[in-house]
Amino acid sequence: MEKAIRNFLSQESAGGILLLVAVALAMLLANSPLSGLYQGFLNTEMQVRFGALDINKPLLLWINDGLMALFFLLIGLEVKRELLEGALSSPSKASLPTFAAIGGMLVPAAIYLFFNFDDPVTKVGWAIPAATDIAFALGIMALLGNRVPVALKVFLLALAIIDDLGVIVIIALFYSTDLSMLSLVIAAIAVTGLVALNRKGVTSLAPYGVLGIILWIAVLKSGVHATLAGVVIAFCIPLRAKDGSSPSEHLEHSLHPWSNFLILPVFAFANAGVPLGNVGFDSILSPVPVGIALGLLLGKPIGVLLFSYAAVKLRLAELPKGIGWHQIAPVAVMCGIGFTMSMFIASLAFEHGGELYGDLARIGILLGSLFAAVIGYFWLSKVLPKAGERI
C-alpha cells in the first residue's frame, strides 16, 4: 500500500508544479498586451453537430464541461475504490476523515456567508471555499518525501476524497438550473444501461464509454452540470472482475497522468487568468475575495481541527496510530488549498453574476490557496522528523 501511495504522490507532485506554471502563464497573459488574444482564444466558439444534436459552446465551457467531466470520472473512481476497499471501507477507517471533511466544508462556508449573506448576488458563492484541491494538496505534501508518515498521507487523501464527494453533492443540489425533462429521461435511460452492464458483469470499458458519452450529452442538455456524468459512470464501472482484475483501477491508473499533466493544467490556464488592471486594493478587500480567502485560510483548518477533535473526544473516531495533533494541524491548513476545485465552483456560482465577481472570486481563491500551501508546507516540514531520522 505504501509503494502505491508513494507512486501516486510522486505523480501528483509533478502535476502540482505544472499547475503552478499554468496559473503563472495565465496571469501573465491576462495582464499583458496579449490579453485580448488570451480571452479571444478562450471565447472561440466550437460546434459539434450530429443529426439533430447541436452543441455550440466557447472553448472555455468545453474545458469546464468536457475535460472536467473526465476529472470527475477519475474522482468517482477514487471514491468508489476507497469506499469499497480502501481508507473509507469501514466505519472505523472513515470516521475521522469524514468528520474532518464535514467541518472543513461547513466552517469555510459559514465564514463566506458572514461577509456576503446580505448580498443575493454574491452569497451564491458560499460553496467556493468549501472545496479542497486534492491534486495540489497531495502535491505539496509530496514535496516532503519520505518524511511524511503513510498514515498522514492516507488521512489527507481520505479527507480530500470525502470533500470531493461533498462538492459533487453541492453541485447537483445547488448549481443545476432550468432542467429539461426530455434530457433527464434520456440520462436516466443511459444510467439504467450502465447499471445493467455492471450487474451483468461486463468488464470491457467500450460499452461503458458509449453509454457514458450519451449520458454526458444528456446531462449537458438537461441543466444538471455535465461533470456529474463522470461520477455516475465511475460508480457503474466494476471494481473487480471474476478473474480478480480491476477494470476500475485500470481506468483510474490510465486517467491519472492525463488528469495531472493535461486536464487540470489546461483548466487552470483557462480559468486562472485574472486581469488586474481594474482591480484596486478596495476590490481585493471586498466581501467576495475576503470571504473566500479567509474561508480557505482560516475556515478550513478551524473546521477540520474542531470537528476532528470533537469526534475523538466523543469517542466517535480515533487518531491514526503514531499521528498526533501537531501533525494533523498543518495538514488541516493544507486542506485550504482550494485552487482548481474552488475555481470550478466559482465558475458555476458566478456564471450569470457578471465577470467582475468571477475575477474577484479567483483573486480570493489564489490568495487563500497560496497562503494555505506555503504555511501548511513549512509548518508540516517543521513538525516532521528530519530526513534520515526515524518516523
UniProtKB/Swiss-Prot annotation:
InterPro entries: Na/H_antiporter_dom_sf, NhaA. One of its GO terms (molecular function) is sodium:proton antiporter activity. It catalyses: Na(+)(in) + 2 H(+)(out) = Na(+)(out) + 2 H(+)(in). Its main location: membrane. Keywords: Antiport, Cell inner membrane, Cell membrane, Ion transport, Membrane, Sodium, Sodium transport, Transmembrane, Transmembrane helix, Transport. Coiled coil: none annotated. GO terms for cellular component: plasma membrane. Pfam families: Na_H_antiport_1. It is found in: Cell inner membrane. The chain crosses the membrane at residues 14-34, 59-79, 95-115, 124-144, 154-174, 177-197, 213-233, 261-281, 287-307, 328-348, 363-383. It comes from the Bacteria. One of its GO terms (biological process) is regulation of pH. It is a multi-pass membrane protein. Na(+)/H(+) antiporter that extrudes sodium in exchange for external protons. Belongs to the NhaA Na(+)/H(+) (TC 2.A.33) antiporter family. This is Na(+)/H(+) antiporter NhaA. The lineage of its organism: Bacteria, Pseudomonadati, Pseudomonadota, Gammaproteobacteria, Alteromonadales.
